[in-house]
Amino acid sequence: MTEELKSAIERAAAALKAFGAREVYVFGSAATGTMDEYSDVDLAVSGLPPEVFYRAMGKAGDILQRPLDLVDLDDDNPFIRYLKEEKELVRVA
């Protein structure tokens, strides 16, 4: 991951926290170091109020300037459980 992208992820995480997220994590290729120029950025949040989720996602995407996959860790579904159980999450903020 380039320093520029790392900085953008940190700024996106700060924006998500400004919208009310308690915690922000990165996962996927950005977390494992296998990201390339075509990769999206996978972020996970907890505590982000549902009424601002998509607005916050748009702001983070604008900062990143690449596709963003934002997941809510407060949801209870198999994918979220997998991320938590397999320790796939790297805390950003």
Protein language model regions, located:
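Catalytic core of pol beta-like nucleotidyltransferases
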Residues: 1-23, 31-37, 48-93
